[in-house]
Amino acid sequence: MSSNTAAPGADITHPQARRAIISSSIGNALEWFDILIYGAFAVVIAKQFFPTGDDSVSLLLTFATFGVSFFMRPLGAVVLGAYSDRAGRKAALMLSIMLMTVGTAMIAFMPSYASIGLLAPAGIALGKMIQGFSAGGEFGSSTAFLVEHAPHRRGFFSSWQVASQGISLLLAALFGAVLNNMLTPEQLASWGWRVPFIFGLLIAPAGIYIRRHLDEAPEFKESSEKTNAPLRDTFVHQKMRLLIGAGSVIMATVSVYLSLYIPTYAVKQLGLPAWSSFAAMSVAGLIMFIGSPLVGALSDKIGRTPFMITSSALYIVLTYPMFVFLTNSPGFLQLLLLQTVIGVLMTMYFAAMPALLADIFPVATRGTGMSLAYNIAVTIFGGFAGLIITWLIDFTGDKLSVSYFVIFGAVLSLIASLSARLVLRLR
């Protein structure tokens, strides 16, 4: 299989392209907006739902709940990914966005621990688990839907998944900066943190409406590669592809969650004001939004792996010095520089990755294969990233522990990207 081997058939018209991009991206954007907002307001949520008398323990419990929701992702990947391979991409996309909306509503309106006791953290955990199940099938189904609309421009079309995450990162950062700057700590704790979740709920009906009026992906409809057991076929016949796919997702996951964790790191470890950390994070989101379609389009011409290999190598070389620089000279400009570098490297890697995943798996098992590969990596290296980093810093007393986690992920993804190029002959 080669990355420049496309299915027969012409690419779709511009109106169809716009509908496909918007419908796929809006659900992905909602998913990531909720994830990013939860992480961005972790310090506030910890005090409202996990009061222990120890801020570090409360924060650990908040991130643990965040991580537990990711255990639902592989289950969602299996159920919704296989559903998309049997019933179609459109049906799976409809189901995933409706489930995401339910989970978001539960978090947005959940009373605090002071109001209903243990039901409050239990309700937050349940809402996050529903979101995790939904997110487990969202990426694979929506990315498959995009690439199957334009087999000759997979890189460009699938990169809009990443651009939509850039919008989510930008919006989450702006909400964080504005709310922290305009509200008192008491107002933020009482009701301010709920505002972005309610905003996310306002987006959901538009996404549901758009997806309901979609046509099925042309390549999926025309394909003769159909299977009644996509999960079995993926595990039996595509184990190496699944392993390489999961490995290739690691650096993308670590990059996003690194950018997400930095506001907490800046406030808790460096003592910087919350608004400055969110303002710096918005730069990474802006770079991701603007740069992703450019990288995706270039990957259609020169291949996916050159971007991914280069980005992984630069992460390995630059991460430790960047955090030494920030830790020794904490300040807004230093934080801004760090987020800018992360934004560039994250975009280089992440924007090329969805098309590579689509190249790895055939049409018949693409929804299942992509969902599993993506969510195995995201569960391990994303869901527990904040928990692992917070614990490492508390356990070792070394503020640079975050850089070791990033470098480890970069090494694994470099190996996976090289394997995709050398073993699977993908470019």
Language-model regions, residue ranges each:
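Hydrophobic core of transmembrane alpha-helices in multi-pass small-molecule transporters
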Residues: 116-136, 332-348
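Glycine-rich segments within core transmembrane alpha-helices of 12-TM secondary carriers
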Residues: 134, 156-177, 374-385
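C-terminal ends and interior cores of transmembrane alpha-helices
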Residues: 98-116, 313-329
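Extracellular/periplasmic helix-loop-helix junction of adjacent transmembrane segments
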Residues: 42-75
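Multi-pass alpha-helical transporter architecture, strongest
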Residues: 207-214, 408-427
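Cytoplasmic membrane-interface "Motif A"-like loop-to-helix N-cap segments
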Residues: 86-97, 301-312
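Extracytoplasmic gate region of multi-pass secondary transporters
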Residues: 39, 239-288, 382-386
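C-terminal transmembrane helical hairpin of 12-TM major facilitator-type secondary transporters
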Residues: 305-352
